[in-house]
C-alpha cells in the first residue's frame, strides 16, 4: 500500500496512519509515529534510531529534508506543520501550525512555538 521503505531498528517499527502519503524515495527508520493526512515527500529521511520521532496530523515534510533525534532529545513535530525543502530538524520540538523554511536547521533542545514562521 505505501510507497516508502520502512526499517525496523532494534525491534521497533514505525507506526504510520494509513492516510499518510509517502513520495518515492522517502526513508523511515525506527521509532517514528506519523499522524493522519500527513505527507512525507521525495527523499525525506526520518531517523528515529536512538530516540523517537512524533509527527502530528496534516503535517508535510518536504523534499530532501532530514528529521533526526539525539540520545537525550526526541523530535516532536505538531499538527499542521510545514517543513520546507532541504531542512534539518534535529532533536527538537516544533509546535502546531508552524512553518520551518526551506534550508532551515533546527537543532537539539530548540522549541519552535505554536504558529511560528
Functional labels for PLM-detected ranges:
Residues 117:
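Conserved, surface-exposed functional patches that form binding/active-site neighborhoods
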Amino acid at each position: 500500500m505505501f510507497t516508502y521503505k520502512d526499517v525496523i531498528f532494534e525491534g521497533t517499527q514505525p507506526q504510520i496512519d494509513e492516510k499518510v502519503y509517502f513520495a518515492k524515495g522517502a526513508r523511515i527508520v525506527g521509532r517514528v509515529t506519523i499522524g493522519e493526512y500527513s505527507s512525507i515527500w521525495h527523499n525525506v529521511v526520518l531517523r528515529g534510531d536512538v530516540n523517537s520521532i512524533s509527527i502530528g496530523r496534516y503535517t508535510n515534510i518536504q523534499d530532501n529534508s532530514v528529521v533526526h533525534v539525539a540520545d537525550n532529545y526526541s523530535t516532536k513535530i505538531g499538527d499542521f506543520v510545514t517543513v520546507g525543502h532541504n531542512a534539518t530538524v534535529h532533536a527538537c520540538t516544533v509546535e502546531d501550525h508552524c512553518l520551518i523554511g526551506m534550508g532551515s536547521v533546527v537543532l537539539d533542545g530548540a522549541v519552535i512555538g505554536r504558529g511560528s514562521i
